[in-house]
Amino acid sequence: MLRNTFTRAGGLSRITSVRFAQTHALSNAAVMDLQSRWENMPSTEQQDIVSKLSERQKLPWAQLTEPEKQAVWYISYGEWGPRRPVLNKGDSSFIAKGVAAGLLFSVGLFAVVRMAGGQDAKTMNKEWQLKSDEYLKSKNANPWGGYSQVQSK
């Protein structure tokens, strides 16, 4: 009997959670064209808009206005802060021109060094390489992989 009394008293003391969400839409001026204004807004105003929009998102999604949905998407996934693009417009063409200039410079430097280099080394002529082959054959050097030293034509 005492148990039933405590059970009923316990049921009366239950508190149901009630959410007090903001039911009216944010002003269009606050969320309209948020993409262009977001970076220049003070952080307190940004936090205010974020908190108001997060309260609005707790309601059914159909109750949000279109500018609010766009603002929520931009704040969550837009190109600001860590999601800002690494390259600005025009940077890719600047980088491509720099890479092309570097390649042309390196090819030109290679050509100048080859022209100023003079004659080939004496070990690069065919006679030297054939004599090296004969010497290695007489010493039985590396019989499995071969010992051919001929590289020139």
Swiss-Prot record:
Membrane topology of this protein: Single-pass membrane protein
Upregulation: By oxygen at the level of transcription through heme. Expression drops rapidly when the oxygen concentration falls below 0.5 uM O(2).
Membrane-crossing segments per the record: 89-111
Sequence ranges on the Mitochondrial matrix membrane side: 21-88
Keyword Mitochondrion attributed: yes
Superkingdom of origin: Eukaryota
A Gene Ontology cellular-component term: mitochondrial inner membrane
Segments in the Mitochondrial intermembrane topological domain: 112-153
Similarity comment: family membership: Belongs to the cytochrome c oxidase IV family.
Listed name of the protein: Cytochrome c oxidase subunit 5A, mitochondrial
UniProt lineage: Eukaryota, Fungi, Dikarya, Ascomycota, Saccharomycotina
